[in-house]
């Protein structure tokens, strides 16, 4: 993987202290999507990871909301299906729903029944791996539908939160954030 391409993406990230609340250092990935060159580099690097780290993917599952920014494009380029995992009351039809713990609350994710067939090889994609709670909930949804979870793919990992240790499959990230929270801050 080219250091120049990785550095180009890293230089697009913007940190916002005390957002969305005091003590949080927010890593903003949105500038990547405002620059066509950066977005193209992102998709190329993610596709390279799919081709080298994971074999024969049938389905890419994108997590609401920022997994939707690149998940469908990646699925198109990888010639596989895209399936969204959404918050409650956002999908019609028969659903499988799981609850998961967040830092200060609980939340839920849902997936439509039948969108993943038993035995299909599934890759979960999202923007940032922090504590791993949302990805772990998606793992459970995939396995409940009978999918074979082959891995996770993230744009950015906040390594000091050790979310990778909670996940049920191999995990690949393009970028890593700081190894620890600065000045006792948390990351989001």
UniProtKB/Swiss-Prot annotation:
Enzyme class: transferase
EC number in record: 2.4.2.7
GO MF annotation terms: adenine binding; adenine phosphoribosyltransferase activity; AMP binding; metal ion binding; pentosyltransferase activity
Function: Catalyzes a salvage reaction resulting in the formation of AMP, that is energically less costly than de novo synthesis.
Taxonomy of the source species: Eukaryota, Fungi, Dikarya, Ascomycota, Taphrinomycotina
Subunit structure, as described in the record: Homodimer.
Cofactors required: Mg(2+)
Pathway(s) the chain acts in: Purine metabolism; AMP biosynthesis via salvage pathway; AMP from adenine: step 1/1
Residues that bind AMP: 130-134
Catalysed conversion reaction: AMP + diphosphate = 5-phospho-alpha-D-ribose 1-diphosphate + adenine
HAMAP family in UniProt: Aden_phosphoribosyltr (MF_00004)
Keyword annotations from UniProtKB, A to Z: Cytoplasm, Glycosyltransferase, Magnesium, Metal-binding, Nucleus, Purine salvage, Transferase
GO cellular component: cytoplasm; cytosol; nucleus
Cross-referenced InterPro entries: Ade_phspho_trans, PRibTrfase_dom, PRTase-like, UPRTase/APRTase
Protein name: Adenine phosphoribosyltransferase
Subcellular localization, as worded in the UniProt entry: Cytoplasm; Nucleus
Entry's family note: Belongs to the purine/pyrimidine phosphoribosyltransferase family.
UniProt record, GO biological process: adenine salvage; AMP salvage; purine ribonucleoside salvage
